[in-house]
């Protein structure tokens, strides 16, 4: 598989994602600038964290209109894996690829730390390498990570098993139902606030992110 790591003005986790999928996991990947209009030859998309366009208007709002977005939506419609972490998650909800919205943290402060998570659904294409109900630790670093959805959206997320990760032990940002990561109905688009790409080696504090990327490579190869 060949992955496109999308770069926006203000992205700052792009090299982390490239390193995780290419250098640690051994997949083919390269950077693609946000102004490109084609993703021909790519089999998946990774959207990094950071502060795209300086977070003006809303986090991810301007990036959702970038020239590359129609191609990302095309790949998503074709069933290819699309993964967004932190600002990437914000871009996915702003572009309509995932339901709900992300707003300022409940405490109105930027939160940066290692956070315990629960794997709510280990049958998704992004989590089959995790044990059911596994507790994992991943870094978080965001100021606008409070996930909000209306009652109808929440009911649908629960009914379809779209809630993939929840915050365990404590809720760092006030997200409804402790939601940390969700997928679309089709199961090929994942957005999450935590950073699995920063948890790829024990030397860096933990390697609980490896199984997410391993799941992607196992479940999407050949699709």
Curated annotation (Swiss-Prot):
Primary location class: cytoplasm
Record note on quaternary structure: Part of the FGAM synthase complex composed of 1 PurL, 1 PurQ and 2 PurS subunits.
Keywords: ATP-binding, Cytoplasm, Glutamine amidotransferase, Hydrolase, Ligase, Nucleotide-binding, Purine biosynthesis
Name of this chain's protein: Phosphoribosylformylglycinamidine synthase subunit PurQ
GO biological process, one term: 'de novo' IMP biosynthetic process
GO MF term set: ATP binding; glutaminase activity; phosphoribosylformylglycinamidine synthase activity
GO cellular component: cytoplasm
UniProt cross-references to InterPro entries, sorted A to Z: Class_I_gatase-like, PRibForGlyAmidine_synth_PurQ
Active site: 86, 195, 197
Record PANTHER family: PHOSPHORIBOSYLFORMYLGLYCINAMIDINE SYNTHASE SUBUNIT PURQ
Reaction(s) catalysed by this chain's protein: N(2)-formyl-N(1)-(5-phospho-beta-D-ribosyl)glycinamide + L-glutamine + ATP + H2O = 2-formamido-N(1)-(5-O-phospho-beta-D-ribosyl)acetamidine + L-glutamate + ADP + phosphate + H(+); L-glutamine + H2O = L-glutamate + NH4(+)
Organism: Lactococcus lactis subsp. lactis (strain IL1403)
Subcellular locations according to the entry: Cytoplasm
Protein role: Part of the phosphoribosylformylglycinamidine synthase complex involved in the purines biosynthetic pathway. Catalyzes the ATP-dependent conversion of formylglycinamide ribonucleotide (FGAR) and glutamine to yield formylglycinamidine ribonucleotide (FGAM) and glutamate. The FGAM synthase complex is composed of three subunits. PurQ produces an ammonia molecule by converting glutamine to glutamate. PurL transfers the ammonia molecule to FGAR to form FGAM in an ATP-dependent manner.
Pathways per UniProt: Purine metabolism; IMP biosynthesis via de novo pathway; 5-amino-1-(5-phospho-D-ribosyl)imidazole from N(2)-formyl-N(1)-(5-phospho-D-ribosyl)glycinamide: step 1/2
Pfam families in the record: GATase_5 (PF13507)
Keyword ATP-binding: yes
Its EC number(s): 6.3.5.3, 3.5.1.2
Glutamine amidotransferase type-1 domain segment(s): 2-223
